[in-house]
Amino acid sequence: MKRVLLLLLAVVCGHALERGRDYEKDKVCKELSTLGKDDFRTLSLVLYSRKFPSGTFDQVMKLVKEVVSLTEDCCTEDADPGCYDNRTSALSATSCESDSPFPVHPGTAECCTKEGLGRKLCMAALKHPPQEFPTYVEPANDEICEAFRQDPMEFADKFLYEYSSNYGQAPLPILVSYTKSYLSMVGTCCTSASPTVCFLKERLQIKHLSLLTTLSNRVCSQYAAYGKEKSRRSHLIKLAQKAPTAALKEVLPLAEDITNILSKCCESTSEDCMAKELPEHTVKICDTLSTKNPKFEECCQEKTPMDIFVCTYFMPAAQPPEPANVELPTSKDVCDSKNINVMDQYTFELSRKTHIPEVFLSKVLEPTLKSLSECCHSADSTACLNAKGPVLKKEVSSFIDKGQELCAGYSENTFTEYKKKLSQQLRAKLPEATSAELAELVEKHSDFASKCCSINSPPNYCDSEIDAEIKNLPEP
């Protein structure tokens, strides 16, 4: 499977590697022969659905059909030697046409300014940002079976497209394994004498794989949005907030461990990478943090490692042990090459003492830490930090205050209670507002809070939304 997936990734846009087109073509043809047309087509559909999540079903299917066709045609013994290269070149040319039948990527136009191999490599490298809000909703059992009985192949194709485009950040082997298991369940239960009983039994069998798929999609989406270093900081912030009585030396290795796991597993073609690494990580969490917060202790009583990880992942932040009054590090500390953890220490202290969602802290820490580091490259680092320090501290404090105002009460109440209290607060602030205006404001603020005021809020979406919401806050 590992080699197959790697080669299919190469096929996506005729990705001829430096070792040569003939070498690549031979590999692809061998895998087509090994897999067979149907499995090759299925994997291609999963890959393109992930790669082009904004493409329509018809667009993705046309691309799949074309790639499978050219691979079949060019892999026959009597195929023209230039068949593979010519057909993949024609495929990339068609992708550049204004009325292209294939899915479009925002970066396609730039790739189309290149020619030949450069264009193919450019298109092969295109990636969509993570789908931070999956919209796939599984139909009811009777709807599933009705669609399956009408056309089993079309049902399978549409499911593969919809699920893969929504959960495309899950590691490819996990995504393939789950979708294959799901379709097997549908085929079994929709031909069963007791479909309802069958679905209950089969869903229980694939529950672990389903959970692994959706959760790995979520953590890998955040990793893709942040990148390795920001992801590391993000996990440090979350752990500091969940275990504010722990020490940096206890939470930093855990933040680095989960970041390394995501770095290794999110793009891995190994079928058991995530399934093997996450349980080992949960053991480290429980060994280190179960005495730091009763909620960690509760989570560590769950039956399976995956259940433990889910419990700790969704655990809310604890109440800070003391009010936030964190001093910026000095120029001596910041610029001392031996003091490698000074930025982490500042991040840790600010996070554990601040009751504000991680996306807010990550957003304000990025420019703050960058400004501190820049002082080390100035002619007089001490003077630089003395000048910037008070301004940075004021900006951080102001941003945190605004973030706390935007998310006040969200994590402490049910959503219904939160909206009720929000309505009362807005009514007190805006006594002249009409009922309709008030209702609109409540919906707007509560929608923002539901997406950006939790500990695992999506960074890409919330980055711009936070700016917009803060801009609309009245000046004190």
UniProtKB/Swiss-Prot annotation:
Associates with membrane-bound immunoglobulin on the surface of B-lymphocytes and with IgG Fc receptor on the membranes of T-lymphocytes. Interacts with LRP2; the interaction is required for renal uptake of GC in complex with 25-hydroxyvitamin D3. This is Vitamin D-binding protein. One of its GO terms (molecular function) is vitamin D binding. The keyword Ribonucleoprotein does not apply. It comes from Oryctolagus cuniculus. Residues 17-208, 209-394, 395-476 form the Albumin domain. GO terms for cellular component: blood microparticle; cytoplasm. Coiled coil: none annotated. The keyword Transport applies. Glycans are attached at N86. Its main location: secreted. Keywords: Actin-binding, Disulfide bond, Glycoprotein, Repeat, Secreted, Signal, Transport, Vitamin D. It comes from the Eukaryota. Belongs to the ALB/AFP/VDB family. The lineage of its organism: Eukaryota, Metazoa, Chordata, Craniata, Vertebrata. Involved in vitamin D transport and storage, scavenging of extracellular G-actin, enhancement of the chemotactic activity of C5 alpha for neutrophils in inflammation and macrophage activation. Residues 1-16 form the signal peptide. It is found in: Secreted. CDD domains: ALBUMIN. Disulfide bonds join C29-C75, C74-C83, C96-C112, C111-C122, C145-C190, C189-C198, C220-C266, C265-C273, C286-C300, C299-C311, C335-C376, C375-C384, C407-C453, C452-C462. Pfam families: Serum_albumin (PF00273), VitD-bind_III (PF09164).
